[in-house]
């Protein structure tokens, strides 16, 4: 028999079991803050989509401060919250698994009495998924003060139920996350296989028994004996006509190819100074931080000046070279020819690009290879899409599972 329910009075919670309480956050948890005056090698922790994790200081990603002096100490078993920029922060709550230091901008909360921090981690994650606190936030940075947070009402199951719910969700979520992790690994294997297949076929062709020779170009390696290599300048020429986006549809150069620019994309002041693109042109972004953004344009239009527009010369198969240019090894070669002040932000312009050597099979082989790869990549991408859909379904299942149990709509 289902248990008796009551209205919690909290919009994002709905009904809860009749014996559960509704209290302010400040009644069940309290904010603590201990500043570390001098860093002495403690673990540095960050709040991420994966929870509160240890940062790799030897191979850091993202911004790093000059010193960790002045960071705050955080304690295993507490909750870490980000109460600022909650509209754009992917995850605003995490359970602290290990002692360490973190940015003083975060807010640490310690549970009062025997309330279970794991339970409230799940509850607050459920609320954060839908950004339910956003309408309560103040100022341009969408922030909540710790006092504001303390005055927000929450639900309080009996301690025994908190513990049962937390334990049950730990077990269930672990199993789901394991499946998600394994599925992501399979997706990465498919993507690696796709890259390997493209590189092998565009440089060696479809005949496995053909005699090979060294191309003389390091990034290409061996090619069939009947093939040659040539500079890009002998296969494409640069289209460098300057136009306005008022007359020519603005296009975006993405990793998925050339697409119509979205209406909400931030516009620059250079709308009257763009490059002309004709349908069938190949367009590639010259900046290294846009690696892989390229493709054949299906549209007439215009692109920003950072892009290089290539017009095919003579008899060639544009689709074949589209595959060539999308290989990882070509991307390495392309950006190796670039120039810039910052190592990871180089630009490779036409004057550099035109001297890069590329394989040149016969036009018949180009067509055969392009047709074969189109079919194979469609099959691989379809398998990837199915796995990605499975991940979406599992993520939604996790959210549903957490919601139903932390709000008492399902009983363990």
Predicted region positions:
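Sequence-specific dsDNA recognition surfaces
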Residues: 8-9, 23-37, 41-76, 233-279
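Ligand-binding loop in jelly-roll beta-barrel domains
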Residues: 111-116, 312-317
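A short glycine-rich beta-alpha junction/loop motif
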Residues: 3-11, 100-107, 138-163, 287, ...
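Amphipathic alpha-helical coiled-coil/heptad-repeat segments
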Residues: 1-13, 18-19, 157-211, 360-412
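Short, ligand-facing micro-motifs at secondary-structure edges
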Residues: 40-60, 79-104, 118-122, 131-135, ...
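Non-catalytic DNA-recognition/assembly elements of restriction-modification systems
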Residues: 3-36, 151, 159, 163, ...
């Amino acid at each position: 028999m289902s248990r008796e329910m009551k209205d919690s009075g909290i919009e994002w919670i709905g009904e809860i079991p009749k014996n559960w309480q509704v209290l302010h956050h400040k009644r069940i948890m309290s904010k603590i803050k201990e500043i570390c005056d001098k860093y002495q090698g403690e673990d540095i922790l960050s709040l991420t989509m994966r929870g509160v994790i240890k940062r790799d200081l030897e191979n850091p990603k993202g911004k790093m401060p000059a010193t960790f002096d002045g960071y705050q100490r955080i304690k295993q078993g507490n909750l870490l919250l980000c109460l600022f920029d909650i509209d754009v922060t992917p995850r605003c709550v995490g359970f602290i698994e290990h002692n360490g230091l973190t940015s003083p901008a975060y807010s640490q909360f310690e549970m009062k009495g025997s309330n279970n921090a794991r339970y409230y981690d799940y509850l607050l994650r459920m609320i954060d998924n839908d950004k339910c606190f956003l309408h309560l936030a103040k100022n341009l940075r969408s922030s909540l003060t710790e006092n504001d947070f303390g005055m927000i009402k929450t639900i309080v199951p009996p301690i025994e139920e908190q513990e049962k719910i937390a334990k049950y969700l730990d077990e269930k979520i672990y199993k789901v996350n394991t499946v998600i992790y394994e599925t992501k690994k399979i997706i990465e294997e498919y993507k690696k296989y796709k890259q390997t297949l493209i590189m092998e076929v565009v440089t060696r062709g479809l005949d496995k028994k053909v005699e090979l020779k060294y191309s003389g170009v390091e990034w290409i390696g061996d090619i069939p004996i009947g093939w040659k290599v040539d500079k890009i300048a002998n296969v494409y020429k640069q289209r460098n006509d300057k136009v306005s986006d008022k007359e020519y549809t603005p296009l975006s150069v993405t990793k998925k190819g050339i697409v119509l620019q979205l209406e909400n994309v931030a516009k620059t002041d250079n709308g009257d100074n763009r490059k002309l693109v004709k349908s069938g042109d190949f367009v590639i972004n010259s900046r290294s931080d846009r690696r892989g953004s390229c493709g054949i344009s299906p549209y007439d239009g215009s692109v920003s000046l950072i892009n290089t527009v290539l017009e095919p010369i003579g008899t060639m198969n544009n689709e074949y070279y589209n595959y060539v240019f999308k290989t990882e090894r070509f991307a390495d070669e392309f950006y190796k020819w670039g120039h810039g002040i910052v190592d990871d932000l180089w630009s490779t312009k036409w004057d550099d690009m035109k001297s890069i050597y590329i394989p040149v099979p016969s036009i018949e082989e180009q067509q055969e290879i392009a047709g074969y790869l189109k079919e194979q990549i469609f099959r691989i991408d379809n398998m990837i899409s199915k796995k990605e859909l499975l991940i979406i379904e599992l993520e939604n299942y996790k959210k549903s599972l957490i919601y139903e149990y932390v709000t008492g709509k399902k009983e363990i």
